[in-house]
Amino acid sequence: MATIYKVTLINETEG
């Protein structure tokens, strides 16, 4: 579950 959270965070930062 932490992986999805991390990917979401990166995607949000990348824009």
From Swiss-Prot:
Keyword set, alphabetical order: 2Fe-2S, Electron transport, Iron, Iron-sulfur, Metal-binding, Transport
In the UniProt record, the signal sequence range is none
A GO molecular function for this record?
Answer: metal ion binding
The record describes how the cofactor is bound as: Binds 1 [2Fe-2S] cluster.
Q: Which domain of life is it from?
A: Bacteria
Domain spans labelled 2Fe-2S ferredoxin-type: 5-15
Entry cofactors: [2Fe-2S] cluster
Family to which the UniProt record says this protein belongs: Belongs to the 2Fe2S plant-type ferredoxin family.
> What's its job?
Ferredoxins are iron-sulfur proteins that transfer electrons in a wide variety of metabolic reactions.
Protein's name according to its UniProt entry: Ferredoxin
Q: Which organism is it from?
A: Anabaena sp. (strain L31)
